[in-house]
Regions:
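Catalytic cores of DNA base-excision repair glycosylases
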Residues: 22, 27-238
């Protein structure tokens, strides 16, 4: 018990030292650390691929809208039949809400998502000639689309950099001491200031992967984390 108490005290002392050191970081130092984190993540996860199954930008947009508060695996179970029946915005816009609900019924929030899909498809047809727009301002006008979804589309369909702030990106960027903000838009702004645009999409996507595989919401696996030396929240070696 005494030894355990010593280890706990040492752990708290070490973590406190790290926190004090990184709280005194200048913007330049924090930016350097953020870029080092990006490099570590790129080595750990060299291949970037959206796990949502899609064949074109329209299908990616619909799949990302459906992925809110759902697993990618669940979305991938419903989209093949959805896209078989409605491969284009014109078809989806003409479908009944009841039919769309039935096709995506296994997903959370399926009723509200069905309404969003139908309205989004209508907007694509009437406002954008059936094409998915390629600007943030136009994308967030679409039903069911916020900045997170828009940045996924911009980054992966149009190669336009953007920070994708989901629950994993938010949690990890806070644990890494890269932001103290709670609002996703402010987190996006903080991270954007620390990294060059060419890193934005890959960095945030890899943070999401790392959050799913290592840096869990509860009991993060710090001892097998490639970022432990760069993270003020790490308990590795304690």
């Amino acid at each position: 018990m005494f030894a355990s108490g010593v280890r706990l005290a040492q752990s708290r002392s070490f973590t406190g030292t790290k926190n004090r050191r990184w709280k005194r970081e200048s913007h330049v130092q924090k930016s350097g650390r953020a870029n080092a984190i990006a490099a570590c993540l790129a080595r750990a996860y060299p291949q970037l691929k959206v796990p949502l199954q899609h064949r074109n930008t329209f299908e990616l947009l619909i799949a990302v809208i459906l992925s809110a508060q759902c697993t990618d695996e669940a979305v991938n179970r419903v989209t093949p039949e959805l896209f078989r029946r409605h491969p284009y915005p014109q078809s989806l816009a003409q479908a009944s809400t009841a039919e769309i609900e039935q096709l995506i019924r296994i997903l959370g929030l399926f009723r509200s998502k069905a309404k969003s899909l139908k309205e989004c498809a209508r907007q694509l047809v009437e406002d954008f000639g059936g094409k998915v727009p390629a600007t943030m301002g136009e994308l967030i006008r679409l039903a069911g689309v916020g900045r997170k979804t828009a940045n996924v589309i911009l980054g992966h369909a149009f190669n336009i950099p953007g920070i994708i702030v989901d629950t994993h990106c938010k949690r990890l960027s806070q644990r890494l001491g890269l932001t103290q903000e709670q609002d996703p838009t402010k987190i996006e702004a903080d991270l954007s200031c620390l990294l060059p645009p060419k890193e934005w999409t890959g960095f945030s996507h890899r943070l999401i992967i790392h959050g799913r595989r290592v840096c869990y919401a509860r009991k993060p696996a710090c001892d097998k984390c490639v970022l432990s030396d760069l993270c003020p929240s790490s308990t590795a070696g304690s």
